[in-house]
């Protein structure tokens, strides 16, 4: 039966899902999974300053709402208050790079949240050019 659900962000633990080394600086992506079901997922996301993610899409619609800091997606700067709608099958149009203060955002998915990379080899070449090393994470 349909119901209303209330959840507070403080009731969820951060899960570190991506770690990069930018020189000697450790840079992370951390998530709080607020809701997960086959038809919807809601995630509170934190990117440390400089976090760099590959261009990718998802096998569902994906909505981002920027709360704090800034993120650049391809050439588009996304400040607080920006909503980004990535339709099922589309890609972001470039790498995703967190601004100098990092970024906090809410992500909504309407199905599968698995990233679909556009060009993994090009992404790794870009990381090498920038001196960024991916670090394996077990979560």
Regions found by a protein language model. Give the residues of each.
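Short strand-coil-strand connectors
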Residues: 37, 72-74, 99
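Short acidic-glycine-tyrosine-enriched beta hairpin
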Residues: 73-93
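A short, N-terminal "cap"/entry segment at the start of jelly-roll beta-barrel domains
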Residues: 1-39, 121-126, 132-139
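Short glycine/proline-enriched turns and hinge-like loops at secondary-structure junctions
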Residues: 57-59, 76-78, 97-99
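Double-stranded beta-helix
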Residues: 93, 99-139
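Glycine- and acidic-residue-biased ligand/ion/polar-headgroup-sensing regions
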Residues: 58-73
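Conserved short histidine dyad/triad with adjacent acidic residue
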Residues: 26-30, 37-57, 88-91
């Amino acid at each position: 039966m349909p119901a209303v659900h209330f959840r507070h962000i403080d009731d969820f633990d951060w899960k570190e899902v991506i770690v990069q080394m930018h020189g000697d600086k450790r840079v992370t992506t951390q998530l709080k999974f607020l809701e997960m079901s086959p038809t919807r997922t809601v995630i509170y996301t934190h990117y440390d300053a400089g976090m760099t993610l590959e261009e990718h899409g998802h096998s569902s619609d994906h909505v981002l709402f920027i709360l704090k800091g800034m993120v650049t997606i391809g050439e588009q700067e996304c400040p607080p208050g920006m909503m980004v709608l990535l339709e099922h099958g589309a890609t972001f149009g470039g790498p995703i790079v967190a601004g100098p203060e990092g970024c906090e955002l809410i992500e909504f998915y309407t199905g599968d949240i698995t990233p679909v990379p556009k060009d993994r080899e090009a992404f790794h070449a870009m990381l090498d050019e920038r001196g960024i090393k991916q670090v394996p994470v077990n979560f």
